[in-house]
Regions:
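Short hydrophobic/aromatic beta-strand or adjacent loop that forms the aromatic wall/cage
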Residues: 23, 101, 175-182
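Conserved active-site alpha-helix within GNAT-family acetyltransferase domains
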Residues: 150-168, 173
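Conserved acyl-donor/pantetheine-binding loop and adjacent beta-alpha core of acyl/acetyltransferases
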Residues: 46-106, 112-120
């Protein structure tokens, strides 16, 4: 979704969706400086459909006031593909358990460097992921996932060390070659 642009992400994704309960997240600070962030959901299959349904006019406004660029158009196409390819939201009263998902994570390069890690012992990236994993565990979810670019070997290694395992190497609806990792909180 980041391809849609920073305006969409700032004005809608990171602002409206957490207040409505579709997303949760955290910002990590080190020495008073923002070092990184994470966003996640307790409902991987349904959050996007529910957010779209709850915010149709707001999404149309934000999209309509953003300058269309080839990258944004690709982002809109990818989001539409993800909506079409996602599992339908189960009817109330069914036994389908929601799955969590880490949606985005970012840590400033200065806080990911070997020098920073070796001098402080603080692994901001790992701490943010573990915080989301705690959120999934507290929500009593049976499974969580994260989609990682296939060529992002470094972060795939981090997820493996934290107990995540690859499930599929071609993720339906994603244009960027990606790998799905899953984790079972129980």
């Amino acid at each position: 979704l980041s391809k849609i642009g920073t305006s969409f992400m700032r004005r809608f994704y990171y602002n409206v969706l957490p207040r409505q309960g579709h997303l949760f997240g955290a910002v990590a600070y080190v020495g008073g400086q923002a070092a990184g962030f994470i966003s996640a959901t307790h409902d991987s299959d349904g959050y996007m459909r529910r957010a779209f349904r709850d915010n149709l006019f707001r999404i149309a406004f934000v999209a309509g006031t953003s300058i269309p660029t080839p990258r944004r158009i690709e982002g809109y196409r990818e989001a539409a593909g993800l909506l079409r390819g996602s599992t339908p939201v189960p009817a109330k009263g069914t036994d389908t358990a929601p799955k969590g998902e880490i949606l985005s994570i970012g840590v400033r390069s200065s806080f990911r460097s070997f020098e920073f890690l070796s001098t402080t012992g603080i692994d901001v990236y790992k701490d943010l992921i573990e915080g989301a994993m705690d959120g999934f565990r507290e929500a009593n979810l049976e499974e969580a996932r994260i989609i990682v670019d296939s060529d992002d070997i470094e972060n795939q290694g981090v997820y493996r060390r934290l107990g995540w395992r690859p499930r599929q190497s071609a993720v339906p609806g994603w244009f960027t070659p990606s790998t799905e990792f899953i984790w079972n909180p129980r």
